[in-house]
Amino acid sequence: MFMTSKKMAAAVLAITVAMSLSACSNWSKRDRNTAIGAGAGALGGAVLTDGSTLGTLGGAAVGGVIGHQVGK
């Protein structure tokens, strides 16, 4: 049974995200909210702009700012 390249990339991404988030256990709540907002914004920007790099970066920036301001 062979994995397609998309499935392999998705698995590697999931493992990388899980390991990255486990390294953030000592972050403050605001830092975590900023990182989560940036990730969600990047995903939203990529979806809305059909994978455009500029859209992804813009979404990450806006999401990070929103995540930082939540719960202030």
UniProtKB/Swiss-Prot annotation:
What Pfam families does the annotation carry?
Answer: Rick_17kDa_Anti
- One cellular component term from this protein's GO annotations in UniProt: plasma membrane
Indicate yes or no for the key word Transmembrane helix. no
Q: What does this protein do?
A: Provides resistance to osmotic stress. May be important for stationary-phase survival.
Q: Which residues form the signal peptide?
A: 1-23
> What gene is this protein a product of?
osmB
Major subcellular location class: membrane
Top-level lineage group? Bacteria
Could you list the residues that carry lipid attachment of the S-diacylglycerol cysteine kind: 24
What induces this one?
Answer: By elevated osmotic pressure in the growth medium.
* Keywords, sorted A to Z: Cell membrane, Lipoprotein, Membrane, Palmitate, Signal
Q: What is this protein called?
A: Osmotically-inducible lipoprotein B
Give the species this sequence originates from. Answer: Salmonella typhimurium (strain LT2 / SGSC1412 / ATCC 700720)
Q: Where is the lipid attached (N-palmitoyl cysteine)?
A: 24
